Amino acid sequence: MEFIGEEMVNDAFNYWLEKNGFEARVFGLENAFAWNPYSDLIYYSVVMSEQADIMFYEYVDELGLKYEIDNFWLAFLHELGHSETWCFVEEEDYDIPKNITNYDYYRLPREAVATEWAVRFINEHADLVRDLTRIVGPVIDKFFELNEIER
């Protein structure tokens, strides 16, 4: 399915990334948030699992998140965290065991490092996170409106 306005969302994300000196870029919409280590591209999703969101947010709270933040932004910053920390993670840490629970998945070394980076970034750079939501937020809202997607 093709969505109206996907390119404007990508452009808004990439503007913020470039403005703040990040090398990663946003490529587009997928079924889930993801980061590709070979291309350093981030994919975002408009479909979020409510149960997974709750469990992820509980995990993030354990890490000492100081600010309340929507899971969409948290998921994006987690993927950016993969880009920023990939050199600290061993290749075998990218292996995912079969039938893993969300609880255990969040604690895999590569996932934990990316989430810890995101939490630290949010806690230490609240101004940049506000800037992210100010720049990309209205574009995401317009994207949802154009595609008649409920939030």
Where in the sequence are the language-model features?
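Active-site scaffold of zinc-dependent metalloenzymes
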Residues: 25-70, 80, 86-87
